[in-house]
Amino acid sequence: MTGDRGRLISSKLLEHKTAYQVDRELSGTILFFKATYGASIYKLVYETIDPDGKPTIASGTVTVPKKPDFALPILSFQSGTMVKRDEASSTTGFDGNYGIVAMWTSSSGYLTVIPDYLGLGESELFHPYQMAQPNATVIIDMLRATRTFCDQEGLETNGQLFLTGYSEGGYTMMAAHKMIEEEHPEEFTITASAPGAGAYDMSGVMVDLMLSGEEYPSPFYLPYTLFAFDEYYNLWESPSDFLKEEYATLLPPLFDGTHSSSEINAAMPAVPMEIMEPDVVDAFSKDENHPLREALRDNDLYDWAPQSPMRLFHSTGDDLVPVENSRLAYETFQENGATQVELFECDCGTHGEAAAILLFLGFAWIESLADKSQPLSLNHHTVPEKYNLLSVYPSPFNSSTKIIFTLKEGSEVTLTVHDLLGKEIETLAKGRFPGGRYEFPWNASLFASGLYIITLKRTNSQGMK
């Protein structure tokens, strides 16, 4: 059972900023530039599936440039590691790191999509941290919900789809790129992707780093991964089966979605593996087919061949996700026949220090590929913002069809059908309607075959199809 994946459940305007306000927000950061457009951020709640394939809900944000004169490219940005549920984009809006990204990209002329992921925002599941399939599906379903949102709001996109993200967002972006090309090539076409500093080799590079016995700046990464994989792969009966008694009691409550990563790090030893039972570590180290190792191997993302342009970004000084992850992915992609993949390395500092720099460089590359010259269609130039006549579906039709329109506020509305001579032949709706989405059927079996004009009139405004 997969439910109605990508069905938009609700959308809500969270905040609007003018171009001047965006300039003030970004002033003094590496992302500073002259904003071209204001930006409005919306919270979306939509239907998706959990790691077991059962229907569930997820949330995210869509940020829209204000009044561009061209059809919009879509930029899907995947956020980095979060453990606190209310740190997600749909909760923070324009506040926080991801609000800055949304302002920056949308005020440059992109319709910016930021999924919250399962287990964050509205989702009450445990976040499937560093797991490819559930994160890819929630990203893809967010894109589907965004498509519906654009229809409802009368937003015109140009068919370009860019993917990017950093850290966990680099990993989840890679998972989404792979799934789109392998499972949904007829539904989505990726223009280009720019993954940054993702842990694409979970079973190799990242395992070796943890087993090294060295201190690690963000030790909470290890229990986050262990709890997620145990939750969805059923590796152990209880935390005490793999964690030392002290940590089996202390750590699970800290991952309930109400605690920050800094709180969890404060409860962790500097060497992450010290939380685990030595016999479990020993068994894992010696067994290439250990269930945990097999589960990690299932979620490696380096052994395939991207077909769309991709540029990987990574700092050689990354202290959390070694650059070897991107090097291995790049080399394997080439060996597998990929011809449009590049690797950009720089000595940009640690994982945290490099984030803004690499995101900026990735966005600059995306900017070089984006098409912002496609003019809006006639309907989008002439239909006022307060309402929108969305579609007549099916069209053409045999004997019946339905007309869909939206109102952003309560209005007096008349929906009529005219022939090509301008004669009104039927009134489908007339009266005052509250804001919302409406569908009206039209049975045309009593009229001759031909072309007809659907007219939606609102006070002092008119739209036609």
Descriptions of predicted regions:
Residues 196-303:
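Accessory cap/linker subdomain of secreted extracellular hydrolases
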Residues 381-393, 397-465:
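C-terminal outer-membrane/trafficking sorting elements
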Residues 311-318:
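Short beta-strand/loop motif that positions the catalytic acidic residue
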Residues 293-294, 320, 327-374:
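C-terminal catalytic histidine-bearing segment of alpha/beta-hydrolase fold enzymes
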Residues 129-151:
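Alpha/beta-hydrolase active-site loop
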Residues 144-216:
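Primarily recognizes the serine-hydrolase "nucleophile elbow" in alpha/beta-hydrolase
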Residues 52-59, 65-104:
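Short, surface-exposed "cap/lid" segments of acyl-processing enzymes
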Residues 1-69:
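Catalytic-loop region of hydrolases
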